[in-house]
């Protein structure tokens, strides 16, 4: 095949092109992976807990950690019609000692059997009594049977279950009972007069939709903001700014991929014009030339893709991002389709150039070589 | 450069052999030639006769496999590529068959390219370029790009470029192959006028017998071997 | 007459693919750099400004300002350690601020301080008065306004501006220790601290004392109840700082490498087209070095022009981004990107060197 022979004879050119495109694809994939891992690390715990409506204090700006509700407000929320189950939810970052090391964890306290408990466990069982806890397992800091105490002392918590994809604010999460939460907070700050919950986790009564319930709670209790779980996840602090920043970065990277692929295949085609014209003049159909070009494009993009995926796997293992990077195959597939699709669009111009070649130009050309 | 009393070009038993695998091609076979300090010599032969190879060797573009090449007293046959580059910069001028002007430079700038690569005085070079343009009747076209010039005008710029570095020897490859008879005659007249005016020597390679009367002497070359044709 | 520059001027469209790609890559680099700097400054401003070489935390707080507690007795112990010149208490609380006339609340970090940080005046005379970080202007805050903080809407009034004092991406508000305690009591009754208890201590060392040694001495004197570190260590220990730096730098370095590859590819293709001209140049006496110098010159010019256009692009993008996205452009980062781009461009052009050297002047005549 003429197309692959040309590549074999000019490895530097095509190597550089595949390398550049591969690196750019890697940038897109890596940033995509970073984005989805980051978003999940911010809000995974929220997504995994059972309350489909979350009620925060209204000055908390949709921020669970900034929210604090007095017990009478919790009562008011619980008595709004349409509420199936309601329970206080405590959220706080604490320093704990695990395996002899001090690490920061997001502690989430919920009453056993009530909304706020993690819904999906990877192993073990939920926390049913004080002194038990379920940990998110990404950072491998916790295993079933481990004992965890706050750095300030206080009663220990035994890990009875593990869950995944449940980090909060880019920290490992520990799901405990609300009583355990309260006692750990008191142990950390003996000056505190009381421990108030951060939010109320609510499951609507049968037949009531979460959005409708959230609106009624908002109307009935003015000091709170009620969000559906989806809204809470989307509105959590850091989510929209992260998405905004990455949107800019990803857009720029994807546009560069398309441009580089398109431009450089165009240049390669223009440089071959003499040879291509000759081929047309001796009877090669236009479709043959276009097919050759597309074969090269597919080959180059294929190599680039391999480079990109290889680098992605290396980078997710090697770079210290502080959060567990999980490659999301679905997002990766979508990114690949977008990148390859745009690259092919870029190449369209080169294809048009090939189709435009007029075989008559082979005759009367002042010589294939020379400058003018 | 001043006039040297010695020959502008001396070839002694020059031989050029190309090897590809086991096969050997002899492009030039023991050619000997002497060109006087202000002499014009025409080299005539069919394509493949080795005349272009001989021209390249004379101008320091190729090194011979065997033999001596002496240009205006410099024995260049043993020069390394770097020294050959300096030699070409200072001592010879070329007029190429396919004109080879830089497409994005004006006529004047195409002349100045030659002195750009040397450490010559910029003002003097510019004055020299303008003078050449006048002699070649190109003053009006000095600021035109090659695509704005006619075929004959482009050829004249190429001729001017060959003289920019005040060479001892000018080597001209098929100057009329792309031009009709009338234009070809005009260009040859111009070349001869310039060569005579500066007392430079010239070797002109051509397959066009109609142009040989411009030269002082014509030599034939066939299959790499130089012979004498009738002198003019 | 410089050949390289003439070609750039007379045939600019020839260089469009490389320039356009580099413009976008510059935009990417400046945006990445701007995000990294914005995140860093927004997270660490308050700590970087603190006076003194050391910061003392409670040892069970894992270097978290918010979870650290230092009582009056410990503070007294710290003050007595040899090598300690001055000690100041610092406390903070993170909450939302309602701004008059604005629908959205701003996230703020209210600090109570004894010793003024760099760029911040001495604590305001009256309780309830604070200085505000200039970043809050983007949220509509004005001098003289009264902000309502926390769920109980505790009022504080803005009496002046300070800059680069944000903490954990929340706008810095700076008031006396009384103001801080009152706001804490109002907004977070479950986190109040006894009078005389601070969260961290800022410690200045006497002239000639080694800060690292003094830090160790402090922690020994308190029986291990404190953890004292240098200010820069404390800054780097803020959540996410080192990880942001390594992640962003990995992406930035990759992007620079892409720029080098794009330039390399471009000049390889350009050199192929120029083989004819270069052979002629060599025939009339140009050396490979002279020709290659032209290539490098063009690579540098392309990098410079692309950087300038790319910088405009980045500034435009920056203007369109909402204030919640911590994007900060700085001259030093811009200079870094410019220099990096020129270096990468030069390296990329070097890939064509062998090709230029291999061009045989004899081909001009055949």
Task: Identify the residue ranges that each predicted region occupies.
Chain C
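A short amphipathic helical element positioned immediately N-terminal to and/or at the very start
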Residues: 1-9
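C-terminal membrane-exit region of the final transmembrane helix in multipass inner-membrane proteins
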Residues: 3, 337-366
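Hydrophobic alpha-helical transmembrane segments of multi-pass inner-membrane transport and secretion
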Residues: 12-39, 243-279, 300-309
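Hydrophobic, regular-secondary-structure patches
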Residues: 26-106
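Transmembrane alpha-helical interface segments in multi-pass membrane proteins
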Residues: 29, 277-322, 336-344
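Membrane interfacial helix motifs at helix-loop boundaries and amphipathic/re-entrant anchors
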Residues: 35-45, 49, 62-64, 230-250, ...
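Hydrophobic secondary-structure segments that place a key small or acidic residue at a functional site
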Residues: 90-93, 98-187
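Mechanotransmission and gating elements of multispan inner-membrane complexes involved in transport
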Residues: 153, 162-255
